[in-house]
Swiss-Prot record:
Biological function: Catalyzes the irreversible NADPH-dependent deamination of GMP to IMP. It functions in the conversion of nucleobase, nucleoside and nucleotide derivatives of G to A nucleotides, and in maintaining the intracellular balance of A and G nucleotides.
HAMAP family: GMP_reduct_type1 (MF_00596)
Tree of life domain: Bacteria
Protein name: GMP reductase
Binding of NADP(+), residues: 108-131, 216-239
Family annotation (NCBIfam families): GMP_reduct_1, PRK05096.1
InterPro entries: Aldolase_TIM (IPR013785), GMP_reductase (IPR050139), GMPR (IPR005993), IMP_DH/GMP_Rdtase_CS (IPR015875), IMP_DH_GMPRt (IPR001093)
Provenance organism: Shigella flexneri serotype 5b (strain 8401)
């Protein structure tokens, strides 16, 4: 046993210090990034935000809606090959280039993903997702996926430390997914005591990944557009959003009605709700590490997408970054004890 005494920070612990700017308008800010990925060699341009690969976020409808904003969607792994075929038949190449195919690490997952990728060559992204990316089995699966799909861009996680980030990149991942426990419907930290404050995880993993020519996506912990800006400021190449995109018409959650008001169910992928839906219940040897919440219906996701992108542009103007690419270079974080004036929050 040992204790690390370095202070680790989450998004709520900091604000971004404003700096002199020559920008005249938020409209002057370019949010589109252009990337060429280390292993796949593929190039991609777009807004580097990803809708999370959750049942109640990463849907085909979400992918179609967010593609118009140049935003990616990691489509969850529970759609059948036939459902994928129907989606592909009704989608343009522009939509498909904004789609990630999500998979687990079982043999069945591998075979299913292979079938999906064979449906259309425009599917260039694979998202290999497990709760704990520290297992040897996971690293071996990433290497297997890289060998099988040498020209596909592979995103893999989740991890929170630099050395594991490096191992995944060396094993074939182009993008490493960073985050254990920060999600809005994740209870891993309270069920297991395991986790890492998200901003520090992003800063440390970005440093490790960029040293090898890899990239990271900050997954979890964002509750506001300001948090998205902080993640990019901390060095994230991409930011993945779950709760901020839940509860919309495109989210795919079950709708329930209480006292005449409609709500949408949103749950973590290790929650009892998810395990009952996909594997028949919680296995006797494990505990659920997610929760289910009821969200008031929020309408079309386009309004939320505009709000997030608008906040991000504004953050860039406050620090003088004319492009999103410049945000991390222009960011100075200050530690704080408060984020906002909350006097009217309960009204």
């Amino acid at each position: 046993m040992r204790i690390e005494e370095d202070l680790k920070l989450g998004f709520k612990d900091v604000l971004i210090r404003p700096k002199r700017s020559t920008l005249k308008s938020r409209s002057d800010v370019e949010l589109e990034r252009q990337f060429t990925f280390k292993h796949s060699g593929q190039s991609w341009s777009g807004v580097p935000i990803i809708a999370a690969n959750m049942d109640t976020v990463g849907t085909f409808s979400m992918a179609s809606a967010l593609a118009s904003f140049d935003i990616l969607t990691a489509v969850h792994k529970h759609f059948s090959v036939e459902e994928w075929q129907a989606f592909i038949n009704n989608s343009s190449a522009d939509v498909l280039k904004h789609v990630m195919v999500s998979t687990g690490t079982s043999d069945a997952d591998f075979e299913k993903t292979k079938q999906i990728l064979d449906l259309n060559p425009a599917l260039n992204f694979v998202c290999i997702d497990v709760a704990n990316g520290y297992s040897e089995h996971f690293v071996q699966f990433v290497a297997k996926a890289r060998e099988a799909w040498p020209t596909k861009t592979i995103c893999a996680g989740n991890v929170v430390t630099g050395e594991m980030c490096e191992e995944l990149i060396l094993s074939g991942a182009d993008i490493v997914k960073v985050g254990i426990g920060p999600g809005s419907v994740c209870t891993t930290r309270v069920k297991t005591g395991v986790g890492y404050p998200q901003l520090s995880a992003v800063i440390e993993c970005a440093d490790a990944a960029h040293g090898l020519g890899g990239m990271i996506v900050s997954d979890g912990g964002c509750t506001t557009p300001g948090d998205v800006a902080k993640a990019f400021g901390g060095g994230a190449d991409f930011v993945m959003l779950g709760g901020m995109l839940a509860g919309h018409e495109e989210s795919g959650g079950r709708i329930v009605e209480e006292n005449g008001e409609k709500f949408m169910l949103f749950y973590g992928m290790s929650s009892e709700s998810a395990m009952k839906r996909h594997v028949g219940g919680v296995a006797e040897y494990r505990a659920a590490e997610g929760k289910t919440v009821k969200l008031p219906l929020r309408g079309p996701v386009e309004n939320t997408a505009r709000d997030i992108l608008g906040g991000l542009r504004s953050a860039c103007t406050y620090v003088g970054a004319s492009r999103l690419k410049e945000l991390t270079k222009r960011t100075t974080f200050i530690r704080v004890l408060e984020q906002e004036n909350r006097i009217f929050n309960n009204l």
